[in-house]
């Protein structure tokens, strides 16, 4: 574009956009350009799982400590709620890994996943 009076052609603009994107059009067709769980990185999923495990155990411990302080049952409630918090954390991690957490309510998510798997089997 040495001459400023002539506008660039549409083909030239399209070619330059494709070069600037780095050929991303082919990547989007593969699903890499989509949003949601398909685009989530392994590091992001790992961080989410670890945060959920830590927070559920911490919340369980806090509830147990509060109940122990209130009721005077020294380590009993804390141990019970730490175990319950750990179980809740493992259950949440399982949901994340299986992809069952993308809708409200586990039942709806399971139904949607079963429908999707049924459609894959038919194809």
From Swiss-Prot:
Topology term for the membrane: Multi-pass membrane protein
Record InterPro entries: Atp1_alphaprobac, ATPase_put
Compartmental location: Cell membrane
Pfam families named among the record's database cross-references: ATPase_gene1
GO cellular component annotations of the record: plasma membrane; proton-transporting ATP synthase complex
Keywords, comma-separated and alphabetical: Cell membrane, CF(0), Hydrogen ion transport, Ion transport, Membrane, Transmembrane, Transmembrane helix, Transport
Compositionally biased spans, kind Low complexity: 29-38
GO biological processes: proton transmembrane transport
Basic and acidic residues composition-biased segments: 1-19
Transmembrane spans: 43-63, 70-90
Signal peptide coordinates: none
Annotated region (Disordered), positions in chain: 1-38
Similarity comment text for this entry: Belongs to the bacterial AtpI family.
Task of the protein: A possible function for this protein is to guide the assembly of the membrane sector of the ATPase enzyme complex.
Protein name: ATP synthase protein I
Native source organism of the sequence: Rhodospirillum rubrum
């Amino acid at each position: 574009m040495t001459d400023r009076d002539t506008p660039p052609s549409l083909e030239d603009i399209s070619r330059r956009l494709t070069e600037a994107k780095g050929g991303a059009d082919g990547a989007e067709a593969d699903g890499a350009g989509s949003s949601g769980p398909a685009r989530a990185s392994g590091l992001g999923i790992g961080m989410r799982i670890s945060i959920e495990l830590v927070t559920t155990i911490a919340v369980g411990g806090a509830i147990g400590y509060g109940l122990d302080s209130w009721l005077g049952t020294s380590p009993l409630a804390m141990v019970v709620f730490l175990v319950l918090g750990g179980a809740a954390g493992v259950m949440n991690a399982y949901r994340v890994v299986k992809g069952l957490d993308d809708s409200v309510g586990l039942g709806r998510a399971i139904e949607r996943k079963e429908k999707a798997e049924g459609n894959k089997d038919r194809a």
